């Protein structure tokens, strides 16, 4: 059996809903603002399922780092194996540039060659989030300076 918990900030960001329903025996839908499914976080639904007696051999978490961090914190509490799919910046795909460097179990790993899937209980999410924020200012600037070719009005 496959149980899926899918979460989005709001209804207008929902993707792959039908695909999750087709691949799952149970789907819990969560949104931060309550415009889709149940208002709350994926960890709320996961905790509820576990505490209601559902047994899981493995949890797979894919999404924002902060979400995966707290899914792992929860599953560790219940001793449930958890795999996370890490997607840091990958430049050359060989591990030589170090752009996708992660700390997993106290060791340096490269998502492009060693992953992208890792034991979530061993990933240092704080370091991964810190590294992920490296280009935040550059990305914000790129959004602000985006091409206005399709804008109705250019200021």
Set out the residue ranges of the language-model regions.
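Short, basic, helix/turn surface patches
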Residues: 32-37, 57-62, 108-118, 135-136
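Iron-sulfur (Fe-S) cluster-binding modules
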Residues: 1, 16-27, 47-56, 117-155
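FNR/FR-type flavoprotein reductase catalytic core
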Residues: 1-91
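Local cysteine-cluster metal-coordination motifs and their immediate loop/turn environment
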Residues: 65, 87-117, 145-150
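Short amphipathic alpha-helical patches
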Residues: 43-44, 69, 95-99, 124, ...
């Amino acid at each position: 059996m496959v149980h899926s918990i899918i979460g989005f900030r709001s209804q207008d960001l929902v993707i792959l809903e039908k695909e999750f329903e087709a691949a799952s025996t149970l789907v819990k839908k969560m949104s931060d603002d309550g415009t889709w499914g149940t208002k709350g976080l994926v960890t709320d639904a996961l905790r509820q399922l576990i505490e209601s007696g559902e047994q899981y051999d493995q949890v797979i978490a894919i999404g924002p780092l902060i979400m995966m961090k707290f899914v792992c914190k929860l599953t560790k509490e219940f001793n449930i194996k958890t795999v996370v799919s890490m997607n840091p910046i990958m430049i050359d795909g060989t591990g030589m540039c170090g752009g996708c460097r992660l700390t997993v179990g106290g060791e340096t790993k490269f998502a492009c060659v060693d992953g992208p899937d890792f034991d979530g209980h061993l990933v240092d999410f704080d370091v991964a989030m810190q590294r992920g924020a490296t280009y935040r200012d550059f990305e914000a600037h790129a959004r602000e300076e985006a091409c206005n070719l399709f804008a109705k009005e250019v200021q």
